């Protein structure tokens, strides 16, 4: 059995020291770092010898790709290219497609329309992740 922990990239050294096998980083938080903080975090990750194998929180709460109006497929594609490039840059292998708020069907949207939009978003996510050699795992959320 292997153990990982969800935390920020700046904690890579501590995670290794505590005996964890890997670190799980937030996509949105890591993408939100300024260039200097990102570089420092990447250096800390490399120096610690711990791997950032898995990433969570793929999408920011401001996105919604099931309602058909908040986030276009074009905007989603641009975002995913940046996200997957960052994950690959940190040698990530897996990203969790959770992000419940982004895939919540608003009451005014027909369920079938929301479902079709979600399928499009999942396919696009998988296609882009595949180009970077990243596996997408879907978190089974029920709300």
Segments (PLM) and residue ranges:
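Active-site acidic/histidine proton-transfer and metal-coordination neighborhood
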Residues: 66-143
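Histidine-centered beta-alpha loop that forms part of the nucleotide-sugar donor binding/catalytic region
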Residues: 8, 57, 100
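Conserved beta-strand positions in the central sheet of alpha/beta enzyme cores
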Residues: 22-24, 54-56, 96, 137
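Extreme N-terminal starter segment of soluble prokaryotic enzymes
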Residues: 1-3
């Amino acid at each position: 059995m292997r153990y990982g922990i969800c935390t920020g990239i700046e904690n890579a050294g501590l995670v290794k020291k505590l005996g964890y096998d890997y670190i799980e980083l937030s996509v949105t938080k890591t993408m939100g770092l300024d260039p200097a903080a990102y570089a420092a975090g990447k250096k800390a990750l490399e120096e610690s010898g711990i791997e950032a194998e898995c990433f969570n929180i793929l999408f920011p709460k401001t996105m919604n790709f099931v309602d058909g109006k908040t986030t276009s497929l074009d905007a989603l594609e641009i975002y995913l290219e940046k996200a997957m490039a960052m994950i690959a840059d940190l040698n990530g292998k897996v990203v969790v497609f959770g992000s419940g708020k982004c895939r919540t069907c608003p009451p005014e949207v027909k369920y079938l329309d929301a479902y079709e939009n979600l399928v499009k978003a999942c396919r696009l996510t998988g296609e882009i992740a595949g180009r970077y050699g990243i596996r997408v795992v879907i978190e089974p959320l029920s709300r």
